Amino acid sequence: MGNGINKVLPDLYLGNFKDARDREQLARNNITHILSIHDTAAPILQEMTYLCIAAADSPTQNLIQHFRQSIAFIHQSRLKGEGCLVHCLAGVSRSVTLVVAYIMTVTTLGWQEALAAVKIARPCASPNTGFQNQLQEFQTGELQQFREWLKEEYKENPFNDEEDIRNLLTKASTEEDAELQNN
């Protein structure tokens, strides 16, 4: 139905609008929570738990204002052991920006490393320049406060997200080096 969802971390997936309607794909990945961010975001499947954010794919659209709510929604879903799909229309810009902000908050990675990891999991990932600037602004501004808030709010973090992301980056780098040597 859609292009297929991509697993970024355990119980965290990226996809597009069509993927968010694909019950078979959602069930296969134990997805019970959907974070929908696009112009006309609204709940579609009754059996899902939704966070819907109306936002345009425009460099001037402020996504930072939605980071805390999005991060909490994703984290709560994962803590329950339930999958969370984050999607916009194409699964390229808005949804990727929210997932990068989440990764930055649950790890020590900056926005560029977090985005590089997401691109490995979902090669079409490409936030518009305005969203990239907002991620950079988040990194130099509120990120540390968000990390502290997450620790205070949810106490223990049972995930190995930092290790998972660094392994993903290392694996991709090793594969790239091997490919260069073979050519």
UniProtKB/Swiss-Prot annotation:
The keyword Nucleus applies. GO terms for cellular component: cytosol; nucleus. GO terms for biological process: signal transduction. It comes from the Eukaryota. InterPro entries: Dual-sp_phosphatase_cat-dom, Prot-tyrosine_phosphatase-like, Tyr_Pase_dom, TYR_PHOSPHATASE_DUAL_dom. The keyword Hydrolase applies. Gene3D superfamilies: Protein tyrosine phosphatase superfamily. Pfam families: DSPc. The active site is at residue 88. Keywords: Cytoplasm, Hydrolase, Nucleus, Protein phosphatase. It catalyses: O-phospho-L-tyrosyl-[protein] + H2O = L-tyrosyl-[protein] + phosphate; O-phospho-L-seryl-[protein] + H2O = L-seryl-[protein] + phosphate; O-phospho-L-threonyl-[protein] + H2O = L-threonyl-[protein] + phosphate. Residues 4-144 form the Tyrosine-protein phosphatase domain. PROSITE patterns: TYR_PHOSPHATASE_2, TYR_PHOSPHATASE_DUAL. CDD domains: DUSP22. GO terms for molecular function: protein serine/threonine phosphatase activity; protein tyrosine phosphatase activity. It is found in: Cytoplasm; Nucleus. Activates the Jnk signaling pathway. Dephosphorylates and deactivates p38 and stress-activated protein kinase/c-Jun N-terminal kinase (SAPK/JNK). This is Dual specificity protein phosphatase 22-B.
